[in-house]
C-alpha cells in the first residue's frame, strides 16, 4: 500500500477525468488518477484515435488522439502534484476516519475524496482466448494501435474484421514489411470503401479462418496458427507483431458493491455531482441525473463543480472561493 494520502482520487483517465485532474491541480490539491487501461485517454484514445470529433469547445475539428495529447500536455503543469496509476481496476473502497482506502486489483490507495469519471466502466479488450496470450500482451501482441510507426518494416498479422482491423491493415500496408489479416467470416464488417482498398492492396487476406494457437517463448509470440472454418486446413503465420482487433467491452460490474445509488451502469448524483456517500462524486458518463446529455463537453462542465465540492468537503474551514485561471497562472 502507498501510505501517501491524496486529496482527490479520480477513477478514470478519459478526457473528463483528465480535465478534472487538471482543474484540481489548478485549485492546489494533490491528485491521483487510477486508470484500468495501459494508457490514458479512455474511448477517444482507444476506440477512435484517428476519428474526427466536431463537438469539442474551441476546436472546429480534432481527432481523438489529438484531444488526449492536448489533455496530457495540459496536465504537465501540475506533474509534481498528480500521480497516475495505469492498468489498475478499482474493486472497492471503504471510508475510515475521513480517509478512503481504495482497493484495486493491484494495490491499495488512500484518498480524502473520490471522483468517479470512469464512463460506462472499465475497458477490457476482447481476447483471442488462446493459451499463453497473457504472456505476450503489451510485448508484441497488441489490442489497439496508437502509433503506426512502431510497425514499420515488421511482419504484422491482424485478427479481426471490423473498421479498426481493416483500417489498420490498409495503413500498415504502406509501411510494414508484410501484413496479413485473419477474419472468421468471408465478408468483412468494415466500411465498403475500406474493404475495397484492402482487396486491392498487398495485404494477405485469410477468410474464413479462426486462430487456434500461438507459438513463442515466454514473452514474445513468433507465429499465429489459424484453421479454415468448417475445414481441416491449418496455416502457421510467422510474425513480428500480432494485433487483435476484436473490440473492447466495458463493465461497471463492481458498481453494485460500492453502496452507491445507481441506474444501469451510471451513478445517480445530485446537482452538485454528489453521490449517496459523502466525499464521493461522479461526473461524465459515470454520472446520471435528469436531463443528462452524454457528451464530452458536458463532462467538462461537470468536472469543476465536482472538484470544488470535493475541496469544500475536504477543507471546510479554508477560503475556497473559486478564482479564475488567469489569476492563478502567471
From Swiss-Prot:
Enzyme class, one word? oxidoreductase
- Relay the cofactor remark from the entry: Binds 1 FAD per subunit.
Query: Could you tell me the keywords of this UniProt record?
Result: FAD, Flavoprotein, NADP, Oxidoreductase
Indicate whether Nucleus appears among the record's keywords.
no
Q: Which cofactor does this sequence's record say it needs?
A: FAD
Name the reaction it catalyses: 2 reduced [2Fe-2S]-[ferredoxin] + NADP(+) + H(+) = 2 oxidized [2Fe-2S]-[ferredoxin] + NADPH
Superkingdom of source: Bacteria
Q: Which residues bind FAD?
A: 35, 43, 48, 90, 123, 285, 326
Q: What is its EC number?
A: 1.18.1.2
For this protein, the record's Pfam families field holds:
Pyr_redox_2
Q: Example GO molecular function term? A: ferredoxin-NADP+ reductase activity
Looking up SUPFAM superfamilies in the UniProt record yields: FAD/NAD(P)-binding domain
| UniProt xrefs under InterPro entries | FAD/NAD-bd_sf (IPR036188), FAD/NAD-binding_dom (IPR023753), Fd--NADP_Rdtase_type_2 (IPR022890), Ferredoxin-NADP_redctase_2 (IPR050097)
What protein family does this chain belong to?
A: Belongs to the ferredoxin--NADP reductase type 2 family.
UniProt cross-references to PANTHER family, sorted A to Z: THIOREDOXIN REDUCTASE 1-RELATED-RELATED (PTHR48105)
- Oligomeric and partner information: Homodimer.
Q: Write the protein's name.
A: Ferredoxin--NADP reductase
* Organism for this UniProt entry: Streptococcus agalactiae serotype V (strain ATCC BAA-611 / 2603 V/R)
Amino acid at each position: 500500500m502507498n501510505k501517501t494520502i491524496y486529496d482527490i482520487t479520480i477513477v478514470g483517465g478519459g478526457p473528463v477525468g483528465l480535465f478534472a485532474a487538471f482543474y484540481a491541480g489548478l485549485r492546489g490539491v494533490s491528485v491521483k488518477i487510477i486508470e484500468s487501461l495501459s494508457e490514458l485517454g479512455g474511448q477517444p484514445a482507444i476506440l477512435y484515435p484517428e476519428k474526427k470529433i466536431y463537438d469539442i469547445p474551441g476546436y472546429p475539428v480534432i481527432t481523438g488522439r489529438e484531444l488526449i495529447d492536448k489533455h496530457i500536455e495540459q496536465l504537465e503543469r501540475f506533474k509534481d502534484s498528480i500521480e497516475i496509476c495505469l492498468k489498475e481496476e478499482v474493486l472497492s473502497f471503504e471510508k475510515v476516519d475521513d480517509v478512503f482506502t481504495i482497493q484495486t486489483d493491484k494495490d491499495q490507495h488512500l484518498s480524502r475524496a473520490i471522483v468517479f469519471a470512469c464512463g460506462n466502466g472499465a475497458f477490457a479488450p476482447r481476447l483471442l482466448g488462446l493459451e499463453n496470450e497473457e504472456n505476450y500482451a503489451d510485448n508484441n501482441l497488441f489490442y489497439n494501435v496508437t502509433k503506426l510507426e512502431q510497425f514499420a518494416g515488421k511482419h504484422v498479422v491482424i485478427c479481426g474484421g471490423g473498421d479498426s482491423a481493416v483500417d489498420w491493415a490498409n495503413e500498415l500496408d504502406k509501411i510494414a514489411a508484410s501484413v496479413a489479416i485473419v477474419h472468421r467470416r468471408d465478408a468483412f464488417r468494415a466500411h465498403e470503401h475500406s474493404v475495397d482498398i484492402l482487396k486491392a492492396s498487398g495485404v494477405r487476406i485469410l477468410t474464413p479462418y479462426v486462430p487456434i494457437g500461438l507459438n513463442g517463448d515466454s514473452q514474445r509470440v513468433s507465429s499465429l496458427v489459424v484453421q479454415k472454418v468448417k475445414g481441416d486446413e491449418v496455416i502457421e503465420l510467422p510474425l513480428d507483431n500480432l494485433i487483435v482487433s476484436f473490440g473492447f467491452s466495458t463493465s461497471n460490474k463492481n458498481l453494485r458493491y460500492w453502496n452507491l445509488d445507481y441506474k444501469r451502469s451510471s451513478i445517480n448524483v445530485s446537482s452538485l455531482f454528489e453521490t449517496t456517500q459523502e466525499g464521493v462524486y461522479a461526473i461524465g458518463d459515470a454520472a446520471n441525473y435528469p436531463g443528462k446529455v452524454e457528451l464530452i463537453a458536458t463532462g467538462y462542465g461537470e468536472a469543476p463543480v465536482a472538484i470544488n465540492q470535493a475541496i469544500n468537503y475536504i477543507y471546510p474551514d479554508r477560503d475556497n472561493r473559486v478564482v479564475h485561471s488567469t489569476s492563478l497562472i502567471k
